Amino acid sequence: MKNNRSSGPEFSRKYIAHYGLRTKNLEPMVDWYKKFLDAEIQFDMGFGAFMTFDEDHHRIVIFTDDETVDKTANSAGVDHIGIGLPDFKSLVENYERLKTQGITPSLPVNHGFTTSLYYDDPDGNQVELTVDNFRTKDECREWVRGEKMAAAMKPPNFGEVFDPEDLARMFHAGASDAELSRIGIK
């Protein structure tokens, strides 16, 4: 694939405003996302809910209708939604908060340029909590464009799997961000 950015006017929005999920399991999905995102319902439609976790009016909408069918494994479409966190402290705090509510990651993986915890919602959609392993976005971009990215991005996990309990222990023992960013790397 080639990087063919338009030479015309720049795309004017620089963030994803929200995402929508269709489900057959409305209440379990709304409950899970309330816990996962520490979100609140802004508007309950009866057949769905608009929810937010920040100052915006909504970041996620979950809804159902009579025509909704179950998701199938490995179907084409969105693979996961990634939510960026500012630092390892936030990643560990969210991991521990969610664990107390019975929500644990299905895949903890160090991609080299990010450290990520992937979670499965009640419908099997993956949601990723991720933190950059470098201090600047430029350093991350340089890593992604280099040979290390090609070496790291191998199926099935596209990085090195690690135990999130090890990450939490290291964090609480005072490990630096540089040390935490190496978790799972052999």
Indicate residue ranges for each PLM-predicted region.
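Short, glycine/acidic-rich beta->alpha junctions
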Residues: 43, 89, 109-111
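Conserved short beta-strand elements that form part of the metal-binding/catalytic scaffold
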Residues: 40-75, 94, 120, 126-134
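Amphipathic alpha-helical segments
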Residues: 24-40, 97-101
